[in-house]
Regions:
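ABC ATP-binding cassette signature C-motif
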Residues: 1-222, 303-500
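Flexible nucleotide-interacting loop at or near the entrance of a catalytic core
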Residues: 220-324
Length: 500
C-alpha cells in the first residue's frame, strides 16, 4: 500500500536518513521516535513532497492513495480563518458533510460554538482537535500525523488512541507520548544520531513500542557484554604475545656468537611472533554499541521547608477580557508538594498557571522557574542559547552551563546558535537547564514533557519526582501525572476539583 526504497535525506551536507527501506500495509501503525532534531518531521515532509530544503534520493510509492497530513504547526494564513472556513471550502461542502461533522464534534468533545471563532483565538489543544476533525472529513487512505497528542486533553487522547487502533488505513505518526505509543504502535522506526551527532542511524521493527524498548535494552546489554569480553580476551592475548616476544628478544641479545644455528632459530621464531602480532592487530573486535541515549541532569542543593506556605490564591471570578473562565478558584500549596492541574482544552489552565506566576515572581523568599506553554514568551528568539544563559554568572558558571547543555545533548553548534532554530524539545530542555543553574525551588511548568522524546521523558519524570522543591504544573501526560504529581486537580468552570 505504501513503500519506501533506499531513501536518503540530506540537509546542508548532513545526512539525517541513509538507505531507509520499508513497506506499510493496511492496518499498520508506524510510530517514528527519536531525540529532537533527528529528522522525524523532516521525514514526514519528504514523504509528502513538502520539504524543498532537503536533498532526497530514493523512491516513495503510495499507489495513488489519498494522503491526510496533520502538521505540527498550522500555516499562518489558516490562523486567520474561523473553524468553519478552515474545515470547509464552500457552503456546499458543509451541507454535504453536516451529519458527519456533528457526529465527530461529539466524539472529539468539541462544542460547535468553537467553529465560529478564529483559529488564532483557540488554545493549542483546540487547534489540534480541529485539525484532526479536518482529516476525518477528508477521509484519506493513509494518515501522517506529526505530534498529534500535543496539547490534547486526556479525554481526547484516549479517543485518539482508540481511533488509531481501530482505523483500517495505515497511520504514520511522530509522537513523544509513551502511553499512546504503548497502546497503538505495531511498527517502530527509531531515528538516531550517533558518534556525537556526526552519523545517522535508523532501526525498523514490526513490533509494539514496549517490546521494542525491551528488545533494544536487552540487545544493547548483550552487544556491550560481548564487546567487552572480546576486548578482555584481546588484551590477554596481546599481553601473552608481548611477554613471549620479550623473552625471545632477550635470548637473541644474549645468545653466544658461537651458536649461529640457535641464533637463526630465534630469528625465525621472532619473525613468526611478529606475524602473529600483525594478525592480532588486524582482528575485527566487536564494538561497544554507540547509541543515542536520553538526557542527564539533576537539581543540586535545592530544598524548601515542607510546611512553608508557597501559594494561597482565591479568585472569585477568573476571566480574560469579558470571557469568564471559572468561578471560585482556590488553591493552597505547601513546600515539597507537586500539584498537577488537568482539564479540557481551552478551559483556562495555562492562563491560571500564568496568573500563579505573576503572583509569585517577585517573592524574595523563593526562586521561581516558569515554563510557559509558548516557549517564545520566555526569551528573545534571536538570542543564542549561551546568551540566554549568560545572565546567570561568571565564566566559571558559563562553563558549568556548557557542561549541563552537553548533558542535555546540545551540540556546540546548537549552544552557539539561535534559539529560534531549536526544536520544541530542545527549547524545553534549555529552560530546564536554566532552572538547574539558577537553583530554583518553585517550578511552574506548562506541559513540561510535551515535546521531549520518549527516551528522555523518563529522565525528566524521575528528576522532577525527586525534586525537593515545589512543582505546580499543567499536564495531559498520563505517565507524568501518575509518577510525579502528589495532588491532581481538575480545572472546571466552577473551580478546582481534587481528583487525587
Amino acid at each position: 500500500m505504501f513503500e519506501i526504497k533506499n531513501l536518503s535525506i540530506q540537509i546542508h551536507n548532513q545526512y539525517f536518513i541513509r538507505n531507509l527501506s520499508l513497506t506499510l500495509n493496511a492496518g499498520d501503525k508506524l510510530a517514528i521516535i527519536g531525540e529532537e532534531g533527528n529528522g522525524k518531521s523532516t521525514l514526514l515532509k519528504v514523504i509528502l513532497g513538502i520539504c524543498p530544503y532537503a536533498e532526497v534520493e530514493g523512491t516513495i510509492f503510495s499507489k495513488n492513495h489519498s494522503i491526510g497530513y496533520l502538521p505540527q504547526m498550522l500555516e499562518s494564513n489558516d490562523l486567520q480563518k474561523t473553524g468553519y472556513e478552515y474545515l470547509f471550502k464552500s457552503l456546499e461542502d458543509y451541507y454535504n458533510q453536516v451529519n458527519f461533522l456533528y457526529q465527530n464534534l461529539e466524539r472529539l468533545h468539541i462544542d460547535d460554538s468553537l467553529l465560529e471563532r478564529t483559529l488564532s483565538c483557540m488554545s493549542g489543544g483546540e487547534k489540534v482537535k480541529l485539525s484532526i476533525l479536518k482529516l476525518l472529513l477528508e477521509k484519506p487512505d493513509i494518515l501522517f500525523l506529526d505530534e498529534p497528542t500535543n496539547d490534547l486533553d486526556i479525554e481526547t487522547l484516549e479517543w485518539l488512541e482508540h481511533f488509531i487502533v481501530e482505523t483500517k488505513c495505515p497511520v504514520v505518526y511522530v509522537s513523544h507520548d509513551e502511553t499512546l505509543l504503548s497502546h497503538t504502535a505495531n511498527c517502530i522506526l527509531h531515528l538516531e544520531r550517533i558518534y556525537r551527532k556526526t552519523e545517522c542511524k535508523h532501526t525498523f521493527y514490526r513490533t509494539t513500542y514496549d517490546d521494542y524498548v525491551r528488545m533494544r535494552r536487552e540487545s544493547l546489554a548483550k552487544e556491550t557484554m560481548i564487546a567487552k569480553q572480546e576486548q578482555r580476551d584481546y588484551q590477554k592475548r596481546e599481553e601473552k604475545l608481548r611477554q613471549v616476544m620479550q623473552k625471545v628478544e632477550y635470548q637473541q641479545n644474549t645468545i653466544s656468537r658461537s651458536n649461529p644455528h640457535g641464533g637463526r632459530l630465534l630469528k625465525k621464531k621472532m619473525h613468526s611472533l611478529k606475524s602473529q602480532e600483525r594478525k592480532l592487530h588486524d582482528t575485527n573486535l566487536a564494538k561497544v554499541p554507540d547509541v543515542e541515549e536520553g538526557i542527564s541532569f539533576r537539581f543540586e542543593n535545592v530544598t524548601i521547608p515542607r510546611f512553608k506556605k508557597i501559594l494561597t490564591i482565591d479568585i472569585p471570578t477568573f476571566q480574560v477580557d469579558t470571557r469568564v473562565l471559572a468561578t471560585n478558584l482556590h488553591l493552597e500549596v505547601m513546600g515539597n508538594e507537586k500539584v498537577c492541574i488537568i482539564g479540557s482544552n481551552g478551559i483556562g489552565k495555562s492562563t491560571f498557571l500564568k496568573t500563579i506566576y505573576e503572583t509569585l515572581r517577585n517573592r524574595s523568599d523563593i526562586r521561581v522557574g516558569y515554563m510557559p506553554q509558548n516557549y517564545e514568551d520566555a526569551w528573545d528568539e534571536n538570542q543564542s542559547v549561551l546568551e540566554f544563559l549568560s545572565s546567570i554568572g561568571n565564566k566559571e558558571e558559563m562553563q558549568k552551563a556548557m557542561t549541563y547543555l552537553g548533558n542535555m545533548k546540545f551540540t556546540v553548534e546548537e549552544m552557539n546558535g539561535s534559539i529560534r532554530n531549536l526544536s520544541g524539545g530542545s527549547k524545553a530542555k534549555l529552560l530546564l537547564t536554566r532552572f538547574v543553574l539558577e537553583k530554583v525551588d518553585v517550578l511552574l511548568l506548562d506541559e513540561p514533557t510535551r515535546n521531549v522524546s520518549p527516551l528522555s521523558n523518563p529522565v525528566i519524570r524521575d528528576v522532577l519526582r525527586k525534586f525537593q522543591g515545589t512543582i505546580i504544573s499543567v499536564s495531559h501526560d498520563r505517565k507524568y501525572i501518575s509518577e510525579v504529581a502528589t495532588r491532581v486537580y481538575r480545572f472546571t468552570k466552577n473551580g478546582l476539583v481534587l481528583e487525587r
